Amino acid sequence: MSPVAGAKFVRTPLQLYRYLLRCCRLLPSEAMQKHYQHAIRQSYNSHVDEDDPQRIQMIIQRAISDADWILNKYTKKK
């Protein structure tokens, strides 16, 4: 289950971009937030010209699962 509501509704690269930026707000420190926001922007810009629908869906699924993993890693109670 995704930590941020709406992951199942992500269908386009722009929706993914917005979803991932919302996920960043859940990270514990501002430095982490800035780091991952920068990484998200870089990745978005590097894939902006992708036009294969299957490849786009693969990227979306992978990005959501990676975001879930990162949020679980940093927000897990010890």
UniProtKB/Swiss-Prot annotation:
Question: Can you tell me which family this protein belongs to?
Answer: Belongs to the complex I LYR family. LYRM9 subfamily.
Q: Which Pfam families match?
A: Complex1_LYR (PF05347)
InterPro entries associated with the record: Complex1_LYR_dom (IPR008011), Complex1_LYR_LYRM9 (IPR045291), Complex_I_LYR (IPR052151)
Q: What is this protein called?
A: LYR motif-containing protein 9
Superkingdom in the source lineage: Eukaryota
Q: Source species, please?
A: Danio rerio (Zebrafish)
